[in-house]
């Protein structure tokens, strides 16, 4: 059991980081979608919320379609390479999302982020691989706790770090940060994934 502690901690952190990346958009997504769609010239207040739903759903659609493939691939090549692939996808696509300049880009990037990240399913399979029958419920509960903690931290990070030019000033008081008010939370989550 002692030899399994490091992988369990790593698996806990993988799920935590995934959930932070998934949920950090919640506080700012409505404004981000509105900004992107207004720049594209095709939104009104009646359809804004519909587009927010599309952006949110695009991530889960990507996961729905590609998690079975990633799970099967993890059976062949091992759990760790697929978990690493998911973290790399998180890093790349969180940065790309924060820099999206059109609504279609935001939708596409969120879809690709979901498609490249089957880490929750692979983590559960990994725990099944390294756990006895008696250990399994507690370890799956640990993953559930990580999931919940990420759901709590993600929106906090997204809300606090949005619009740093106005919120923090100083080094963020530049035209670039003013033009990219949603990039800092995405970058922060991307850096967590990269570590």
Question: Which residue stretches match the model-derived regions?
Answer:
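Conserved MFS/SLC helix-loop-helix module at the cytosolic interface between two early adjacent transmembrane helices
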Residues: 64-103
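Residue-level signature of mid-helix packing/kink "hotspots" within the transmembrane helices
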Residues: 56-68, 118, 151-152
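Extracellular/periplasmic helix-loop-helix junction of adjacent transmembrane segments
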Residues: 32-64
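Pair of pore-lining "gating" transmembrane helices in MFS-fold secondary transporters
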Residues: 4-36
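Symmetry-related core transmembrane helices of the 12-TM Major Facilitator Superfamily/SLC fold
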Residues: 179-195
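Cytoplasmic loop-to-transmembrane helix junctions
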Residues: 48-51, 135-142, 181
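Cytoplasmic helix-loop-helix junction between adjacent transmembrane helices
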Residues: 108-147
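Glycine-rich segments within core transmembrane alpha-helices of 12-TM secondary carriers
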Residues: 140-166
């Amino acid at each position: 059991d002692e030899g399994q502690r490091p992988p369990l901690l790593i698996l806990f952190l993988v799920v935590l980081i995934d959930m932070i990346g998934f949920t950090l958009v919640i506080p700012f997504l409505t404004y981000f979608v509105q900004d992107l769609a207004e720049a594209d010239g095709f939104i009104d207040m009646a359809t804004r919320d519909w587009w927010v739903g599309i952006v949110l759903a695009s991530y889960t659609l990507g996961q729905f379609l590609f998690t079975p493939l990633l799970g099967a691939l993890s059976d062949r090549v091992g759990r760790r390479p697929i978990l690493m692939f998911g973290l790399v996808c998180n890093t790349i696509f969180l940065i790309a999302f924060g820099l999206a300049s059109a609504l279609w880009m935001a939708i596409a990037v969120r879809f690709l982020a979901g498609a490249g990240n089957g880490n929750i399913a692979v983590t559960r399979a990994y725990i099944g691989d390294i756990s006895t029958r008696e250990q399994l419920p507690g370890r799956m509960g640990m993953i559930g706790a990580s999931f919940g903690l990420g759901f709590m931290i993600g929106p906090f990070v997204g809300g606090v770090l949005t619009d740093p030019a106005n919120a923090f000033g100083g080094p963020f008081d530049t035209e670039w940060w003013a033009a990219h008010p949603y990039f800092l939370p995405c970058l922060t989550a991307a850096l967590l994934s990269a570590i």
